Amino acid sequence: MKLKLFGSTLLVAVASLVVPAHAKIDELRFAYVDNLQDDHGDIVDGKEGSNFEIELVSSSPDFLNFIGSPRPYAMVSANTTDDGVNFGGVGLLWRWEFADGWAFEPGFGYIVHDGELDNPFPDDTPEAAAFSEEHQLLGSRDLFRTTLALEREFGSRFAAQAYYEHMSHGQVLDTGRNQGLDYVGLRVLYRFDPDAAD
């Protein structure tokens, strides 16, 4: 089931990026991220482990000029274990260069995942406690994805980013349980067009 959902998400994500004929693929990105969570004010390793991510970023189509010319992306994220969360989706990235070779890049998107939505066991049972201890309970099959990245360029075609991503339904896509997912990691970028980031 997880493999089918993940494969379907990948196809939808790639198709949505390829459909606009006037946009072209500008960047290919590879990332490694770790799941983190807040444990009573302390940031600790999350329940969902680590993921590898691939992202395609296209040029900004003209119809997005009115919101600052963000660039559309499609991405997939595969967990390194059998028990973690896989996800994929689409979104928009804004990029601002604030110093020579340095840029800040926020993003907003939409993902579909194969993680746990709720606890299948009755409340206040040992099984429910054990399940909650091992899984983030996300409440909705689809989630919003927000990202913040700090980028350093290495020449005209390569760059690296330290970034944070948060995913949750925000009580908009669904109601009720909303533990969300948080990841931090590093990604490397290859630009097919050296002028793509300008």
Where do the PLM segments sit?
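Transmembrane beta-strand segments that form the barrel wall of outer-membrane beta-barrel proteins
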Residues: 26-42, 69-80, 167
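Outer-membrane beta-barrel translocator/channel fold
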Residues: 32-37, 105-147, 151
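Extracellular loop and loop/strand-boundary signature of outer-membrane beta-barrel proteins
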Residues: 42, 75-79, 132-136, 171-176
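Residues on the lipid-exposed face of transmembrane beta-strands in outer-membrane beta-barrel proteins
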Residues: 52-58, 90-96, 108-110, 148-152, ...
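Outer-membrane beta-barrel "beta-signal"
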Residues: 180-198
